[in-house]
Amino acid sequence: MYEFYLKRYAEIYFLVGKLEFLLRKHIVATLRDFAQKYSYGEWHQLIPNTPQNKEAIAAAKIASRGLDFESFLPFSFWRHLFRREYFAGLWVPSLHLAFLGIPNAATKASFKIVCRNMKRANNIRNRVAHFNLINAGDHEEEIATLLWLINAMEEPSG
């Protein structure tokens, strides 16, 4: 039974890692482009100045020793960028551009779907990271949620 769950965990954790990589890559790129276009400083200056965000950025900068601190930001940092209060300030002007696989990504409907799936992905990530077998979810649903986000961030083919 242990090997059964271990294989499921490995599959999910790989997808969480891929999603986190894509979030770092695409969100930073879109925010960096926006910051340059409108003469802001660094991309992270566009992030809401909450205590949680400030702490995450400060800790990442220390851990990274000044090099690519984005790689040291926790998954929850990326997840919290997709909150309803950030629709007008982050999603519409910039973040929707990270989701090339969503037609009409700038819409409120698209934003709500991304928010819901990011919240779910964060819960999946936390469950798997803490090896919580008791609260194992529907494996196929978890895979589908993660793949939806991954596919939404990749350019459509064809």
Describe these PLM feature segments.
Residues 1-158:
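Amphipathic alpha-helical interface elements
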